[in-house]
């Protein structure tokens, strides 16, 4: 896969939703931060992986409310869906409305023989997010996986006959390609995020 990074700035004419204190994403983010606060420098810039979907949008809004001026949105354009350019436009408009820098990387995520398209896209995505985080000198990169994703991953592993190591839950914190990734929403059901 190849990576080309470009910056996007688009002015949006739409109002930007703001999270409230009772928002499940904000509450989950605050609870998660209480456990990892010592690992976060007071002035660290933080990445949010932004696909343009409801879950990552909600996480971006919560993170922006929690750390105004410190958030960078990271979008990976896989080019695998016809709507991929529409996602970039949505992300650019959202970030412009928030005043959050958006960094878009285009990757060639075609799968190799013996590799599933999902695995190829995931491999390219994590490598690209790590490259973006390194280039921007970011602290952690926040991912929007939630409780429903945990269940889906477990069921998929069971259906593939995974052994005990393959049935482990998604970690809330991990390192990959030299970058630190956090999943602060793992305890939040998907529908609660989309409220």
Where are these regions (language model features)?
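Core alpha/beta nucleotide-donor-binding catalytic domains of modification enzymes
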Residues: 7-195
